[in-house]
Amino acid sequence: MFPYKIVDDVVILMPNKELNIENAHLFKKWVFDEFLNKGYNKIFLVLSDVESIDSFSLGVIVNILKSISSSGGFFALVSPNEKVERVLSLTNLDRIVKIYDTISEAMEEVRRK
């Protein structure tokens, strides 16, 4: 579906191009079916290769965050590019989701918990 890797027990999702109304539902279903419903509750969403993101996709991110939070897990956005970071800021999503510059920084935070 989308590029990913699992390091220790952390799922690192690495979508590319766009997250928008055309693929957000598929992305959400895939994340829930392949990871959340199988007990993974630590997920990083790497946004460095995402060229654009729309409000529908932001809603999907919030849904994933709520699910992970309710299970005591850890969710973070990693290395959003400038354009995506601007959208996160304008929508105040950067206030409710942890954002890290690198995967290593996010991994350090997970290990501390």
Swiss-Prot record:
Keywords: Phosphoprotein. The keyword Phosphoprotein applies. It comes from Thermotoga maritima (strain ATCC 43589 / DSM 3109 / JCM 10099 / NBRC 100826 / MSB8). Residues 1-110 form the STAS domain. SUPFAM superfamilies: SpoIIaa-like. The modification Phosphoserine is found at residue 55. Belongs to the anti-sigma-factor antagonist family. InterPro entries: Anti-sigma_ant, STAS_dom, STAS_dom_sf. In the phosphorylated form it could act as an anti-anti-sigma factor that counteracts an anti-sigma factor and thus releases a sigma factor from inhibition. One of its GO terms (molecular function) is anti-sigma factor antagonist activity. It comes from the Bacteria. NCBIfam families: ant_ant_sig. Phosphorylated on a serine residue. This is Putative anti-sigma factor antagonist TM_1081.
